[in-house]
């Protein structure tokens, strides 16, 4: 049996279609998704990337994605790609560019 690991979910949405369908800025849906992911144990790391705060089973992450689809049906027509990755060691490199974390 595999041990639980932190998981990363990344996705890409068709922002043009979102703006046409949602009657406004695509930022609204991204803000709502961020809140949803936060409520479900994921931290926003950048753009459309989220990492689980704690180790979890892949089945739990998949259930979160299913709930995300239910909460935001527009995703069924606007998701261009979505990936789930098991996170190993992570190293913060932002400081190499003179940016404080």
Feature roles, as predicted:
Residues 10-12:
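Generic enzyme active-site microenvironment
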């Amino acid at each position: 049996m595999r041990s639980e690991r932190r998981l990363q979910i990344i996705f890409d949405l068709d922002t043009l279609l979102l703006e046409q369908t949602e009657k406004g800025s695509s930022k609204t849906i991204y803000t709502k998704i961020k809140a949803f992911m936060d409520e479900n144990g994921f931290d926003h790391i950048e753009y459309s990337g989220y990492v689980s705060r704690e180790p979890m089973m892949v089945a739990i992450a998949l259930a979160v994605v299913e709930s995300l689809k239910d909460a935001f049906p527009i995703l069924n027509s606007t998701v261009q790609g979505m990936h789930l990755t098991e996170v190993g060691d992570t190293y913060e490199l932002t400081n190499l560019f003179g940016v404080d974390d």
